[in-house]
Amino acid sequence: MTQDEMKKAAGWAALKYVERDSIVGVGTGSTVNHFIDALATMKADIEGAVSSSEASTQKMKALGIPVYDLNSVDRLSVYVDGADEINDRMDMIKGGGAALTREKIVAAVAEKFICIVDNTKQVDILGEFPLPVEVIPMARSYVARQLVKLGGDPVYREGVVTDNGNVILDVYNLKILNPKELESQINEIVGVVTNGLFAKRGADVLLVGTPDGVKTFTAE
């Protein structure tokens, strides 16, 4: 089974968590694209979706799935999204696709976070994948200096502007032993919009595509 086939299996497995007549929170990325394809097969049974990125919005609209603004929605039963890394406590690094702020907002609204990944994303300790930090442009250099003080090696992601009009610093060489603490520390830096640690609001259910099928894990 190829990596993409494992992503597809995880994406389709998430369909069973979608409630009829509900509005579904939808994330961003290659694994989520498979979930969107799956969601399109039951678009007549759901009210629509809230999207965390322009890319996902365009794909869903092209498939005929109604997309709502989050401000017009009172309730999201589930949010389905991928991760760049996830540990056994359901803490994640996300934001490789630069949609981390909107992803974090939609995740905060949802009652249940379903994380879909292939088995290469499971790690013991977060930090091998660089941690994305969304930054207001004028604060880029200042924030980078503060991130160095935290032990990181920030690199400006050239040519990338987020859907919110901001820039991304990718922070390398962080060994993240306390994800919740580091998430708070980075978010307290003036000029940071948010960072890609999803520890305060981690996943509730993890669906992992493996060569032996999809494995399900739930948060304790």
Swiss-Prot record:
Domain of life: Bacteria
Catalytic activity: aldehydo-D-ribose 5-phosphate = D-ribulose 5-phosphate
A single cellular component GO annotation: cytosol
Enzyme Commission number(s): 5.3.1.6
Name by which UniProt lists this protein: Ribose-5-phosphate isomerase A
Organism the protein comes from: Shewanella baltica (strain OS155 / ATCC BAA-1091)
UniProt function note: Catalyzes the reversible conversion of ribose-5-phosphate to ribulose 5-phosphate.
Keyword Isomerase: yes
UniProt: substrate binding residues: T28, G29, S30, T31, D81, G82, A83, D84, K94, G95, G96, G97, K121
InterPro entries reported for this sequence: NagB/RpiA_transferase-like, Ribose5P_isomerase_typA_subgr, Ribose5P_isomerase_type_A
Keyword Isomerase included in the entry's annotation: yes
Sequence similarity: Belongs to the ribose 5-phosphate isomerase family.
GO BP field: D-ribose metabolic process; pentose-phosphate shunt, non-oxidative branch
One Gene Ontology term of the molecular function aspect: ribose-5-phosphate isomerase activity
